[in-house]
Amino acid sequence: MGKTVASLGQGTRPDPVRSFNRWKKKHSHRQHQKKERRKQLKKPEWQVEREGISRLMQNYEKINVNEITRFSDFPLSKKTLKGLQEAQYRLVTEIQKQTIGLALQGKDVLGAAKTGSGKTLAFLVPVLEALYRLQWTSTDGLGVLIISPTRELAYQTFEVLRKVGKNHDFSAGLIIGGKDLKHEAERINNINILVCTPGRLLQHMDETICFHATNLQMLVLDEADRILDMGFADTMNAIIENLPKKRQTLLFSATQTKSVKDLARLSLKDPEYVWVHEKAKYSTPATLEQNYIICELHQKISVLFSFLRSHLKKKSIVFFSSCKEVQYLYRVFCRLRPGISILALHGRQQQMRRMEVYNEFVRKRAAVLFATDIAARGLDFPAVNWVLQFDCPEDANTYIHRAGRTARYKEDGEALLILLPSEEQGMVQQLLQKKVPVKEIKINPEKLIDVQKKLESFLAQDQDLKERAQRCFVSYIRSVYLMKDKEVFNVSKLPITEYALSLGLAVAPRIRFLQKLEKQPSTELVKNPVTEAVPPRAPSLPNDEADESPAYVSEKMSVLHKSGERLEETEHRLASGDGDEEQDEETEDEETEDHLGKAREPHTESVVSIEEAQKVKEVSVQFLNRDDDDEDGPDADFLTVKRRDVFGLDLKENEALSKKEPSKSSVKKKLTKVAEAKKVMKRSFKVNKKITFTDEGELVQQWPQIQKCAIKDVEEEDDTGGINLDKAKERLQEEDKFDKEEYRKKIKAKHRERRLKEREARREANKRQAKARDEEEAFLDWSDEDDGGFDPSTLPDPDKHRSSEESESEDTNHKMSDTKKKQETRKRNNTEDDDVRPRSRHGKKAKWETVEPLDTGLSLAEDEELVLHLLKSQN
């Protein structure tokens, strides 16, 4: 019974395989139902992304600056964090820690920090996050505008943006001068983030169709103090007018501005000021060792060469004050071969060449870069060991930016400043006021290498290099003369002659503006050059950065008015009531003192009223010295002095002037290029001529020959410019008469020479003919080869004339064959003689004299018989 129950119990147990299959079927059904429900409940990607953005925005208010050490501590998008991690950016700097949070909250920020502290990422991260929050696409147009003062800085910012933002879907573009404008215009409308320079951006705003910035969300000014100064004033004002008022603005620089006027121009709303190192002991990095040396002007080149020879395995940057200095010294040092690679970077180079130099210097481990101030701001050259300032900077801020190219991101670096004895006191005092620790060091005279003799030999061999040395000399003197701080820069204390010799020049070139200054009377203009008369202003833009801003020259020209007689003429017209407004178009008048220079006198548009003319006197002195180069553009230099008559002391004088009418003599006559050329011709300058001789001392004909004028130009000056066509036609007619007479003489001489040759040929032919007649011999009969002459016995006997026909026929046949041979020989000789004989002018052969009869020594009957025999043989 028990066994039966057990068997029944075992029979009721379910089959495990069958149970597993049923469970699997149910489980699969449940999973399928869950999957279907998830599909129905799944949100679109854009909605999920929007929810993530909202969570990030909620965390912006919770940012605690003291707790942030990495970028991941900020509430940033995954795409931005991934780009930072791939670009090896993990830890944040002080400026990034304090500004990124404020920028993410949508506030306007003015950030200032030491050089090399990471200001570029401080504004690039908020830029990416701002467009990500708005889910910006390429169809939305321009969203962020980043403006840099130089092309190199804009290029560097664009490269960092490409690395950090490569995971985003935004489109970015680089718009700088030196590239194809049409190529940029075709793509600029689809750009979301635009990195540019002010000049090229304004050009696109004026010329590119359908380009606008109405949807702009953020404006970033890198190196804002430089962009907002007078160099870019007009350009930036025009750009800001085209931008919407409602936007976020970020300003970053190592030396920030607090000018209320500049901030009002940008329409900033309650900006946040972030000065990271405002309370620091020094305004430069702590790892930067800074020194200066005192050196005479004529020893600076030797000091530079000795410095390079002693630092062959270092990476250095040498700063100069002008482009022409860089051009000349770069070529000279390449010939001196100091043993290290030398590169040159300045504003007169083509854009592609500038980018090549920039990338090449970044790649090299040991090299020297000769540069102007375009490389002084923002550029991040890795592992720069030395920064040598060959020329004194214009102020302490410029020094800070130059020295900031080394000791970046807590790395070590050294800076050396070369000062003249006249510059030491003023410059060192300014640096100490800016909290820049500098100390003086001495030069080791044993390591100083003098290169003046080598430079002299280079200039003696190369005329082009000599001209560059002259332009370098004038450019340096001009840059010192135009510096606004006359306590530091005094051109009268410079040893000009010794400096010219140190460049390799035998004689110091002429400096026109100094000569003009010496000729002027001792007025207040000379006593107080610029310091007291000109109001303080922002640092001027260097010459090589002027190409970035078309408004650079116009801004400086806007403070100029007419000088000398032109000022008096203006006062006369205003006082006499000619009009309340006067507009003078820009004119280019060449200087009459030097016709080889290209000096222009620009005049700006000015609106002056009578009352203002009575209160204000402006005296402008303009000194120009332009040098044309294959790479250089024209430099415009201006010096402006203003004197205001606040108390109206000159009212009486102006009233007296108002009663007088402007005389014709006071009006300066405009000089055109044609008039200048005529004056040069009247002075009858003797042009140098190059004469080449062979080794034997014979003169080599120069080709092409210089055309000579038979009629001297004695035309008087015309009132109207240009060329008088009537007088030119008359002159050409006179020249044609002379040319025709010369041509007729040449043809006549050519014919005479040909006739003489023909006459000489006829004489030679006559001589040969006479000689041939003298040598001619007469043969009456021909004998065998053994006989040497004529044998009379061979003649037929008249008595035996009718001999046997057989013997006679044989003799006749023999003689006929010999006669034909002789005749062919004579015909051949006659043909050759006929070729030699000259022909008469009418094409007929010349007649010869009658040949006298030969005396054969035979009787008349024998001669007749001989003739008959010969005639019969010919027939």
Curated annotation (Swiss-Prot):
Per the record, what are the reactions this protein catalyses? ATP + H2O = ADP + phosphate + H(+)
Provide the positions where the record notes the PTM N6-acetyllysine.
Answer: 556
Per the record, the gene is Ddx10
What's its top-level EC category? hydrolase
* Provenance organism: Mus musculus
Residues the record lists as binding ATP: 89-91, 96, 113-120
Similarity comment? Belongs to the DEAD box helicase family. DDX10/DBP4 subfamily.
Q: Where can this protein be found?
A: Cytoplasm; Nucleus; Nucleus, Nucleolus
Q: What functional role does this protein have?
A: Putative ATP-dependent RNA helicase that plays various role in innate immunity or inflammation. Plays a role in the enhancement of AIM2-induced inflammasome activation by interacting with AIM2 and stabilizing its protein level. Negatively regulates viral infection by promoting interferon beta production and interferon stimulated genes/ISGs expression.
* Identification of the protein by name: Probable ATP-dependent RNA helicase DDX10
